[in-house]
């Protein structure tokens, strides 16, 4: 009975989040509080157990990398890179897509997808509308590239931070286990867009020439002092993460110290501090860990592990691949961070032959594949859609041009994302099969 009630609260919480994404951290905190109250009354989940279920190292990673990303973004370097890359494309639709996808991937290696998309999408919209190019395929490619970049490193996005803490993984493990396959998938994605768009050179939508002439691409001014601080802190942090294994120091605490330093040097205003340190994300994932702990305490995740082992018998390869596909399916609806928190305890129980970390890479690839399928699963999908609609509203003279191109809707995104999810899962299956051996 308690198990069913716990599961019902968990499902209800994410049903609320699905309808009210902006208040997701409040919904999760309310759900976590409800589960602690239920567990305390029933004796199945005490406040001490809830506290022990939190991956504090993950929260330290989120804090540290958010602060470093905020410092670099405040310096103007991200916007400068995006604008410079867009100008190098010389107004050719194909090159705008390729180059903006590559710079998005590069930024996402160290910054979460929300920061990356917040920087590159406004630049993309200005360049595309100025040159008469439909921006929707470019933005979709950027969202997917951001997910691939985030999946490539331990510090790129929230799911990998969770997996790093749960699996006691290090920075170098992700570079060796995830980056090579993600680079292959990035190349596959670019080929997919190339083939699907065909002879796509630009001048696809009618743009008011008066607006196009007046809307110059503005280079962001770089604060060299902040940039110097940011690059030094980031460089020292990466060096520390690389050496964390030999030094027997957990990566989260290296990132935490770096984050405190970044906040101290970043000259953030009082109303910017909470955002700069990833406050909303820390609240969300802290509450989420408590909720997942409640599922574990009543045996729901143990049941899932036993079910997975039962249907796959002793076939390690099949078990890892099934975990990957299941994670992808769940991520479409609840997002990568939630899937990572839910499936991490499952992956931790899998003992596979061959590469001992294969279960973690299977889970990471499944989460990444699911995150590209639909906007609810994509970390920055909703933000990109909001930026697109806001840009068109601020420039009503672009309404006819936007209407002439592809419409940036959930359905349009799925037309691109769902086939790519299938391709990524097939290639990921081959990769995991080789690792498990």
From Swiss-Prot:
InterPro entries per the UniProt record, alphabetical: Cit_transptr-like_dom, Diverse_Ion_Transporter
Transmembrane segments: 26-46, 53-73, 95-115, 136-156, 174-194, 226-246, 252-268, 281-301, 320-340, 358-378, 416-436
Topology term for the membrane: Multi-pass membrane protein
Factors inducing expression: Part of the probable 18 gene mamAB operon.
Effect of loss of the gene: Cells have no magnetic response but still make empty magnetosome membranes; magnetosome proteins MamA and MamE localize normally. Deletion of genes mamH to mamV (amb0961 to amb0978) gives cells with no magnetosomes and no magnetic response.
Superkingdom per UniProt: Bacteria
A GO biological process held by the record: transmembrane transport
Subcellular location per the Swiss-Prot or TrEMBL entry: Magnetosome membrane
A GO cellular component entry from the record: magnetosome membrane
Alphabetically ordered keywords of this record: Biomineralization, Ion transport, Magnetosome, Membrane, Transmembrane, Transmembrane helix, Transport
PANTHER family tied to this protein: P PROTEIN
Miscellaneous section: This bacteria makes up to 20 cubo-octahedral magnetosomes of about 45 nm in diameter which contain membrane-bound crystals of magnetite (Fe(3)O(4)). Expression of just the minimal mamAB gene cluster (amb0961 to amb0978), including this gene, is sufficient to form a minimal magnetosome chain with small magnetite particles.
UniProt function note: Plays a role in biomineralization; might regulate pH in the magnetosome.
NCBIfam families registered for this protein in UniProt: MamN (NF040989)
Family listed: Belongs to the arsenite-antimonite (ArsB) efflux (TC 2.A.45) family.
Name the UniProt record assigns to this protein: Magnetosome protein MamN
Lineage: Bacteria, Pseudomonadati, Pseudomonadota, Alphaproteobacteria, Rhodospirillales
């Amino acid at each position: 009975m308690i198990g069913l009630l716990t599961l019902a609260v968990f499902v209800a919480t994410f049903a609320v989040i699905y309808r009210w994404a902006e208040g997701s951290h409040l919904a999760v905190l309310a759900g976590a509080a409800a589960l602690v109250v239920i567990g305390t009354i029933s004796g199945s989940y005490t406040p001490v157990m809830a506290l022990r279920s939190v991956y504090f190292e993950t929260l330290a990673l989120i804090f540290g990398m958010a602060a470093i990303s905020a410092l670099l973004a405040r310096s103007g370097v991200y916007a400068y890179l995006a604008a410079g890359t867009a100008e190098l494309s010389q107004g050719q639709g194909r090159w705008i897509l390729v180059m903006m996808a590559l710079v998005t991937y590069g930024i996402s290696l160290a910054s979460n997808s929300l920061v990356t998309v917040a920087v590159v999408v406004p630049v993309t919209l200005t360049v595309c509308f100025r040159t008469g190019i439909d921006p929707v395929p470019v933005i979709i490619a950027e969202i997917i590239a951001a997910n691939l970049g985030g999946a490539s490193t331990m510090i790129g996005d929230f799911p990998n931070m969770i997996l790093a803490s749960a699996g006691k993984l290090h920075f170098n493990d992700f570079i060796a286990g995830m980056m090579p396959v993600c680079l292959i998938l990035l190349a596959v994605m670019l080929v997919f867009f190339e083939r699907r768009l065909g002879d796509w050179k630009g001048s696809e939508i009618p743009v008011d020439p008066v607006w196009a002439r007046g809307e110059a691409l503005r280079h962001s001014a770089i604060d060299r002092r902040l940039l110097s601080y940011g690059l030094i802190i980031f460089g020292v942090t990466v060096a520390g993460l690389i050496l964390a294994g030999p030094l027997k120091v957990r990566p989260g605490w290296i990132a935490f110290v770096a984050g405190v330093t970044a906040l101290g040097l970043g000259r953030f205003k009082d109303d910017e501090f909470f955002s700069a340190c990833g406050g909303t994300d820390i609240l969300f994932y802290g509450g989420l860990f408590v909720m997942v702990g409640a599922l574990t305490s009543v045996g729901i995740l143990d049941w899932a592990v036993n079910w997975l082992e039962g249907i796959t018998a002793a076939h390690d390869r099949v078990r890892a691949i099934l975990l990957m596909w299941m994670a992808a399916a769940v991520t479409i609806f609840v997002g990568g961070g939630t899937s990572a928190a839910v499936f991490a305890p499952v992956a931790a129980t899998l003992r596979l032959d061959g590469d001992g970390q294969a279960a973690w890479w299977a889970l990471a690839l499944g989460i990444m594949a699911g995150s590209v399928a639909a906007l609810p699963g994509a970390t920055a999908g909703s933000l990109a859609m909001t930026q697109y609609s806001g840009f068109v509203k601020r420039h009503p003279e672009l309404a006819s041009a936007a209407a002439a191109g592809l419409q940036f809707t959930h359905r349009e995104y799925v037309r691109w994302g769902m086939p790519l999810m299938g391709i990524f899962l097939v290639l990921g299956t081959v990769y995991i099969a080789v690792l498990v051996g």
